[in-house]
């Protein structure tokens, strides 16, 4: 074994070889040196573990090829672009919504230059960062006032901390949802200092349940929109206008967490009814919160809208500063909201809306173009076909809605489909799809036409290895 260690070349010899690699030309020399040292430590560990037992495996040409691959892989940015071919539009693991081009340009402009983030250009005095989107939010939703924090969980936390800290909040037992990542409404409420008062049963809650729970310590009646699941069958929940009327009768504030709330009415496109923010506010509810990066199709943000007296109190909460959004999020959100001033323009230009409302005929045509491209580029490496399938909205939205689509199915001939899947994840720009019936499937709903060539190149590179 000791003789094998002597066959491992020096770091300097590898550096001389790798510094000729144009793909590594921009890599700082010290980082290159450190990565080569890591690779050589790995080689020594392979000898100790008995993985390498023959000196032929330690030939310089063999090790140099491995070292190059190791350095290229380890030196890539950890946060990277991926191609989403899963058909899940608001894919939580892949960054949820992608931004409209107008929002991307607004972010770039705000980053390259100074901005009026907190300056009132009319007076030359200090202004509020919330002013950039508050009027837009009010115009689009009908709210009296609004503000934005860094995500919807933060929005819920801030509302409860401001309006109900140390007092009871009455919520239906069937609405104590988990919002993802093990974050649950009861835990968020506990952190806010509010006291949870559950009423009703999991499947049925009546207005009298809320009324009977109200006592001297009650501060708020809360409703949580269960956008990420449905209870069907023997089920009843209280309509928001009735809850609002009860709150006003008893002198209590009312609050609805819409979760992945939307400003766009999807029902004309065959979707089941889903309340819009505008509809919810028309019920008279005092405060509504919703996400920015789900059905809205903007950046991650928690939007709070409602009656001015409550929003002003929330703005003054010291916790608000810890939860406030930055200039890049504000730039992206304002640009996204401006598109909603014309709903049809929003449907066409906000990628999330365009993907969700894409017509089956359009998707079938795009799948055909992708199939022809892959059939040509992967000839002899895989069989390519199209088949009917379903996409999903994702992001905890429309959980029962299957979206008809046309899938492109790739069945490799020289490797198993899981090896193809893993190989695509290891590409410089990973391609994420789904495996069905022994084939790797691509859904054109979440693919851009400009990505067809990239997908074809990645698949060819993996299948030809």
Swiss-Prot record:
EC category: transferase
Transmembrane helix recorded as keyword: no
Main subcellular location of this protein, as a coarse class: cytoplasm
Modified residue annotations for N6-(pyridoxal phosphate)lysine: 294
Cofactor(s) needed for function: pyridoxal 5'-phosphate
Pathways per UniProt: Aminoacyl-tRNA biosynthesis; selenocysteinyl-tRNA(Sec) biosynthesis; selenocysteinyl-tRNA(Sec) from L-seryl-tRNA(Sec) (bacterial route): step 1/1
Protein name per its UniProtKB record: L-seryl-tRNA(Sec) selenium transferase
